[in-house]
Amino acid sequence: MNFELSEEHLMIRQAARDFAQNELKEGVIERDSKCEYPEKQVKRMAELGFLGMTVSTKYGGGGMDTISYALAVEEISKIDNSCSVILSAHNSLACWGIEEYGTEEQKEKFLKPLAIGKKIGAFCLSEPESGSDATQQKTTAIDKGDHYVLNGVKNWITNGLKADIYVVIAQSNLDLGHRGINAFVIDSDTNGISCGPKEDKLGIRSSDTCSVIFQDVIVPKENRLGPEGFGFKYAMKTLEGGRIGIAAQALGLAEGAYEMALEYSKQRKTFGKPLSQHQGIAFKLADMATDIEAARLLVHKSAINKDKNLDYGYSSSMAKLYASEMAMKHTVEAVQIHGGNGFVKEYHVERLMRDAKITQIYEGTSEIQKIIISRKLLK
C-alpha cells in the first residue's frame, strides 16, 4: 500500500484546509450556538467545487477520487462539522446513487444541478420506527400505473429543510418485504411534501436536520432509481460509501481537538512547567496521535477499496466504527486537558466533543457496524 499522497491530493487537502481556516473558523461558535445554517459557507463550498467532488466531469462535478473527498471532509471537520456533514450528505448520500444507478435523463435533470451546487440534496431513509433496521419501511409508494403515490414520514434528514432534491426510500410491495422497496428522486417542492421543525441537536447544530412528510405525493414512474424492488440495495450501497465520509468526519474532528489540546498543553503552565511536560498529559497526547493515525489508515484503505471497485462495505464499517469511537474518546480527553477552559465555548473543544457523538450514531450506529463486521468474519 502506498502511504504517499499524490501532488493532486496534497493540493486538494491544502485547498480544503485554507477554506476551513479562512472562511469557516470565523463565526463557527456563534453559528453553533444559534443553530444558524451556514448559507454563505455552503455557497462557497459550491463555488470551490466541494459539492460535486466525486461526480464525473460529464455531469458538472470534479471527477475526483474518494481519497480526495475524504481529505476535504477531514480538513473541514477540524473546524466546522456542520459544514462537513452538509458536504458529506450531499456528496455521498444524494449525488453518488443518482450517478451510479440513475438513467441519463435523471442525471441530466437531477445530478447536474447537484454537482455544481446549484441545488442541495438529501437522503430520506430513516423513519420514526425504523432507524437501524432499514427493511421495516412504513413509508409507502403505491404503484398506480404511470405513477406512484407516496405517503409517510422520514426523520433525522440532514439538509431536510434546505434540500431542493430528495432521494426517498419507500415500500411498494409489502408481500415482498425488503425486495419490494424502491428508491425515488423527487423535487422537494412537489405537491404534498412538507417539513417538520428544525431539530435542536446536541451537536452539528448549524446543520439542517428535520422530519420530511409525504402526503399523497405523485411520483412519476421515470423518477424511480434502478429497477423495481432495488430500493433496499440502493440504500445499503449508498450507506457503505457514506460511512467513509462519516469516518473522515470523525477523523477530522478528533485531529482538530488533538491539535488544540497539544497547543494548549504547551502554553498552559502548572507546577512551574507546561502541561505537556507532565507525563500524565504527555501520555494522553501520545495516545491521541497514535489513534488518529490508525483511523487515518482505515479511512484511506476504505477509500482506496472504493476507488478500485473492491468490496468496501467491510472496510468502511471498520473505518467508521474505529474513527467514531476514537473521536468520542479523544475529544473528551481534549476537554480534560483544557481543564475548566475546555468547558466553555470559547475554546472550541467542547463543541468538537458534542459533534463527535453523532458519528457513533448516524449512517449506522457503532453496534450496527459491529454486526456488519462480525457477519463478514463468521461467514
Residues covered by each model-derived region:
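Long, acidic (Asp/Glu-rich), low-complexity accessory segments flanking structured domains
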Residues: 215-233
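Short Ser/Thr-interspersed hydrophobic loop/turn segments at strand-loop and sheet-helix junctions
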Residues: 49, 73-77, 170, 186-191, ...
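Short Gly/Pro-enriched turn/cap motifs at secondary-structure boundaries
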Residues: 114, 129-132, 156-159, 173-175, ...
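A short core secondary-structure module
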Residues: 147, 151-196
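Flexible, small-/acidic-enriched active-site or ligand-binding loops
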Residues: 136, 189-220
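Short beta-strand-to-turn element immediately C-terminal to the catalytic PLP-Schiff-base lysine
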Residues: 100-102, 142, 168-172, 185-187, ...
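A short, Trp-centered hydrophobic/proline-enriched beta-strand micro-motif
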Residues: 117-125, 169
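Alpha-helical interface subdomain recognition
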Residues: 1-89, 101-106, 113, 117-118, ...
